[in-house]
Amino acid sequence: MSWGVRLEASVGPAVPITQRSTNYPRSRIVLTSHGSLGDLHPYVAIALGLKARDHETIVATGECYRKKIEALGIGFLPVRPDSDWVTNPDVMRRIMHPRWGLERVIREVLLPVLRETYEDLLAATEGADLLVAMQANYASPLVAETKGIPWASAMHLPIGLASAYDPPVLPGFVGLSRNLRFLGPAF
């Protein structure tokens, strides 16, 4: 089954989108992310690419990013948690701690509003053909299952496990991460 998403590689000059095949049906695709602009920008880029191919794209993220998303001509729907905390230096210091930061994000930012995130995503995916979510969006697979729509988890986080052959570089343990690469998939 094709959802109209096609990856293209080109070694020559780019082919204008108007000259590309348009045999794919128009789809409504919801992309969801939370966190900093570094977390959001990959989904904005995907949304712009899909929009250029005539798909309806919705970025579902924190309310604090509404103006940025809508200024690009991309659909926006709010999903909690709102990421306005990224502008608070005290909160950022706490969640960027090399040892405890990730745990704090999960325990203090994501899990307390998991039910609200689920409810917001249920509303955002109304009529959607596909849900694309960041790895740490725990409500996404539940929403996709409830709605009966396909779900894709996109991983762009440097600490995420992208491959059994390429373990992540752990903050504060760069040397250890590099030295464990010889283990390959055993690590």
Where are these regions (language model features)?
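Extended, polar/charged low-complexity intrinsically disordered and coiled-coil segments in eukaryotic
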Residues: 3-12, 16, 133, 141, ...
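N-terminal subdomain of nucleotide-sugar transferases
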Residues: 7, 16-77
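Flexible, active-site-proximal loop/turn residues at the rims of small-molecule/cofactor binding pockets
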Residues: 35, 83, 137
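Short glycine-/acidic-enriched loop or helix-start segments at secondary-structure transitions
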Residues: 41-43, 69-70, 88, 140-143, ...
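Generic beta-sheet signal
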Residues: 60-62, 79-82, 134, 154-157
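Short gly/pro/ser/thr-enriched loop/turn and capping motifs at secondary-structure boundaries
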Residues: 65-67, 83-87, 158-164, 168
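Phosphate/nucleotide-donor binding subsite
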Residues: 75, 79-128, 185-186
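Conserved nucleotide-sugar donor-interacting segment of glycosyltransferase catalytic cores
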Residues: 112-182
